[in-house]
């Protein structure tokens, strides 16, 4: 019999071939492509959650970007979350079915709990009566006891992370900040056994594919070996034609390959995705490929055509390269164009001058971006749009990207004005492009679009920098991602700065600020990062024809070191030293070009390109504006209000020590800002997600300006440091960051002391008080005030008619004990009078006070209260 035919037989036959036996012996987990997205549910600090479906069954799919975790030095937390959920088999903990991954993302496929989270329920109720609060706290206490007995500390306990099942019972979720003391990789026996239950329920049985997915490596240190092609060969093929341009890579797809363009694009994409999955050297490996995409889009000659390339840029924008498969199969030729179109549309949303288009349509753009068409066939307006689209993929510094002209496609750096003119033309067309593409978005929704970063309109409305024409930009955003778009912009703005870091080796910040004058009205008050980035952007672009000087973006070599961006000038600009997460930046040699930028920086060009008129609205060089310093100092104040507002919207955060501050320069008084919530990170840090800092750049340039660096910042003579992701040993827990949500942090965490399971019991006490009163006990206007209230144990007990019962107040007291060694635990709660009527053994079988009544099985309305309270408009993002 033909061996091929034998291999197609169902495994299990008596005469099974070798291939059939292998299939039986090594079952495979499902691919993420087998899950279809139904709707978004919510989003948190470190990922987004979607309602997915496979085989008629609904799942909650949490999507976490690997690049985010690498840059935030939190890859171990993703592993900890997966391990904690995989090891947990308790009726009060969310069940994890699969742990899947692509080159760029980790997907945790969990059970979907239709009742929403307790935070949403609390928003609806206002507060819970004592009986209801006791039942919820009792179930959470059982969950914590289970976790602690198995060496797991949740460390992010709050109502947001308590989900309500169909029967109304509580299940803990979101172990993204958990600590697992297993000190080894979990194995099959850990997954198969059920130590928590004498008689394991069928609910906790797992298929071989599920078990394999839960014990598999998450691929942070090794490439994903799931491609049919050898990534090294593909990359070498990509690099084989690099000699035609200095400092650049031309597109390996020529006009003669038009018939295989979609396939070639897939190969190239596969190459980049595979390289992107190896964070051993995330900066070096990933960004060399970004240059390829830049050259394909921006520097190909008219004879070699302009090629659209499915690069890591697209993967970063949408994070799930595989989930576009359905669209590609339905229209193979359109597939690459669609993915590039998404990036173009995203760029359109970020355009500075989003004016309604009349002379350009989707067909023109697709024609221009198609690898088999000559861009010169487009009308002038179309060429301008394509020009900016290409610059979206560009990896060079701002002036090089802006100078590109599709009509004169070359690397001449003397065409900057023409580039600016074309950017303006693109801005004229941007609104129409977004509208034109709405039809294309109507194709089957799938997880390809999952990782587009949404933003909040309320934050967008605060971003009124002059280089953005606010009203038009808002309209363009509305077309793409409703409600959450500004977050992308704000993230970009930090990325904005990271590109300035690429300018760093060529343009000195001191000279930049000295040489240019910025009018006070150009500096928007709410966003520090935006203002700083805008100024740097203008400096770089305005000096495009000048000799490039050196700049100083200093980076850290130590796990606890801070990243400082010192900007000093003769005119007493305040020095700015901003605390940053260690792995947010990978140090680069001062002579390295944009090729060495980070994974996130494939999108850095967006903020630079979409502000072409920034230069036009800037005062002439050399004229020092005395109001600049005042304006900049004003910029350093309001973000505290912004951060305060954000803290009230979303509680999931990763904090640095609250004594982090902005160091003073040698010319001005220090401006101090404590690093606050991850919300601040979301709106002002890098594109990859939310960095644990308020206003840092992602880029990381070693500098030749020692007078601007702090003592522990640079180790001279060491151009690189070993990435933390490849260092052996357990990752340090106390790395200078305070992980958690301000209102629920235990004192020992704030004081930087060693902590254990007691931090969860403290958080449980906070939750009990919040259930009974509707507000956390230490809540205040700013995180710093919250921290002070925690350390002082300043609890505002209700009085009069609202007074809590003595038992309730006593229970809160014993849980909120400053001394963690005297803090109550499970034993103390069981003996406490408040819980005297609780049947601890049969709690999961008791009738709960609230039972969800959804309209249908895909109803997510019970999550809306929290989303609304935290200004998360998730119903339309990623559409």
From Swiss-Prot:
Active-site residues, as the UniProt record annotates them: 156
Compositional bias segments (type: Polar residues): 706-716
Modification note: Phosphorylation at Thr-741 by CDK1 during M phase activates its kinase activity. Maximum phosphorylation occurs in prometaphase.
EC identifiers of the protein: 2.7.11.1
Binding-site positions, ATP: 41-49, 62
Gene Ontology terms, MF aspect: ATP binding; kinase activity; protein phosphatase 2A binding; protein serine kinase activity; protein serine/threonine kinase activity; transmembrane transporter binding
Name of this protein: Serine/threonine-protein kinase greatwall
Gene name of the record: MASTL
């Amino acid at each position: 019999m033909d061996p091929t035919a034998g291999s197609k037989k169902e495994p299990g036959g008596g005469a099974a071939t070798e291939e059939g036996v292998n299939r039986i012996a090594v079952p495979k987990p499902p691919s993420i492509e087998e899950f279809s997205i139904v709707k978004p549910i919510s989003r948190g600090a470190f990922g987004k959650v979607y309602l997915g479906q496979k085989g008629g069954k609904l799942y909650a799919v949490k999507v976490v970007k690997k690049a985010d975790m690498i840059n935030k030095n939190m890859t171990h937390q993703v592993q900890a979350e997966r391990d904690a959920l995989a090891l947990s088999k308790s009726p009060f903990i969310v069940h994890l079915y699969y742990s899947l991954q692509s080159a760029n993302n980790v997907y945790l496929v969990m059970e979907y709990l239709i009742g929403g989270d307790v935070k949403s329920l609390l928003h609806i109720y206002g507060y819970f009566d004592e009986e209801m609060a006791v039942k919820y706290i009792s179930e959470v206490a059982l969950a914590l006891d289970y976790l602690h007995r198995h060496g797991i500390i949740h460390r992010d306990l709050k109502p947001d992370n308590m989900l309500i099942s169909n029967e109304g019972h509580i299940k803990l979720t979101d172990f993204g900040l958990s600590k697992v003391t297993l000190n080894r990789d979990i194995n099959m026996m850990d997954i198969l056994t059920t130590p928590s239950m004498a008689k394991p329920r069928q609910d906790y049985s797992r298929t071989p594919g599920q078990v394999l997915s839960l014990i598999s490596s998450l691929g942070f240190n090794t490439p994903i070996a799931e491609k049919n092609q050898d990534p090294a060969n593909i990359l070498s093929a990509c690099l084989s034609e690099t000699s035609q341009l200095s400092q650049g890579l031309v597109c390996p797809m020529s006009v003669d390959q038009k018939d295989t363009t979609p396939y070639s694009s897939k190969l190239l994409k596969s190459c980049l995705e595979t390289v992107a999955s190896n964070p051993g050297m995330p900066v070096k490996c990933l960004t060399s490929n970004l240059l390829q995409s830049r050259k394909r889009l921006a520097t190909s000659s008219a004879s070699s055509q302009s090629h659209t390339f499915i690069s890591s840029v697209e993967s970063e924008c949408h994070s799930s390269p595989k989930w576009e498969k359905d669209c590609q199969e339905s229209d193979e030729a359109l597939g690459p164009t669609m993915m590039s179109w998404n990036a173009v549309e995203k760029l359109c949303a970020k355009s500075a001058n989003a004016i309604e288009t009349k002379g350009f349509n989707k067909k023109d753009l697709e024609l221009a971006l198609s690898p088999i068409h000559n861009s010169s066939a487009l009308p002038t307006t179309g060429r301008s749009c394509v020009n900016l689209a290409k610059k979206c993929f560009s990896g060079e510094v701002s002036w090089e990207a802006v100078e590109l002209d599709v009509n004169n496609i070359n690397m001449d750096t003397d065409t900057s004005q023409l580039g600016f003119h074309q950017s303006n033309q693109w801005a004229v067309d941007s609104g129409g492009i977004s509208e034109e593409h709405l039809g294309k978005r109507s194709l089957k929704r799938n997880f390809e679009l999952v990782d587009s970063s949404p933003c909040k309109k309320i934050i967008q409305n605060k971003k009124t920098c002059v280089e953005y024409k606010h009203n038009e930009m808002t309209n363009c955003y509305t077309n793409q991602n409703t409600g959450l778009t500004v977050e992308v912009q704000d993230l970009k703005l930090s990325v904005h700065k990271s590109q300035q870091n690429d300018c760093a080796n060529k343009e000195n910040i001191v000279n930049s600020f000295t040489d240019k004058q910025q009018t006070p009205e150009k500096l928007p008050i709410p966003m520090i990062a935006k203002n700083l980035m805008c100024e740097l952007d203008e400096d770089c672009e305005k000096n495009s024809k000048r000799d490039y000087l050196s700049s100083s973006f200093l980076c850290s070599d130590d796990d606890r070191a801070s990243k400082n961006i010192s900007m000093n000038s003769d005119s007493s600009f305040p020095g700015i030293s901003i605390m940053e997460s260690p792995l947010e930046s990978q140090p680069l040699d001062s002579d390295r070009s944009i090729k060495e930028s980070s994974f996130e920086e494939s999108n850095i060009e967006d903020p630079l390109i979409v502000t072409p008129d920034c230069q036009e609205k800037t005062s002439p060089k050399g004229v020092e504006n005395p109001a600049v310093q005042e304006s900049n100092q004003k910029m350093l104040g309001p973000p505290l209000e912004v951060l305060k507002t954000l803290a009230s919207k979303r509680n999931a955060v990763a904090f640095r020590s609250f004594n982090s501050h902005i160091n003073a320069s040698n010319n001005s008084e220090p401006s101090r800002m404590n690093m606050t919530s991850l919300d601040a990170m979301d709106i002002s840090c890098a594109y990859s997600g939310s960095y644990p800092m308020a206003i840092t750049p992602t880029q990381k340039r070693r500098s030749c300006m020692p007078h601007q660096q702090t003592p522990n910042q640079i180790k001279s003579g060491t151009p690189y440091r070993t990435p933390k992701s490849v260092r052996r040993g357990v990752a340090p827990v106390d790395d200078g960051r305070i992980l958690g949500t301000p209102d629920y942090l235990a004192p020992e965490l704030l004081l930087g002391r060693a902590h254990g399971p007691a931090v969860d019991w403290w958080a449980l006490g906070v939750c009990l008080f919040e259930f009974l009163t509707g507000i956390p006990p230490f809540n205040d206007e700013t995180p710093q005030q919250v921290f002070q209230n925690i350390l002082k144990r300043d609890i505002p007990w209700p009085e009069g008619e609202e007074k809590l019962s003595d038992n309730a107040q006593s229970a809160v007291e014993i849980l909120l004990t400053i001394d963690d060694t005297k803090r109550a635990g499970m034993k103390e709660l069981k003996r406490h009078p408040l819980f005297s009527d609780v049947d601890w053994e049969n709690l999961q079988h008791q009738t709960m006070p609230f039972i969800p009544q959804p309209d249908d099985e895909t109803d997510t309305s019970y999550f809306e209260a929290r989303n609304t309270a935290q200004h998360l408009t998730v119903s339309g993002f990623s559409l």
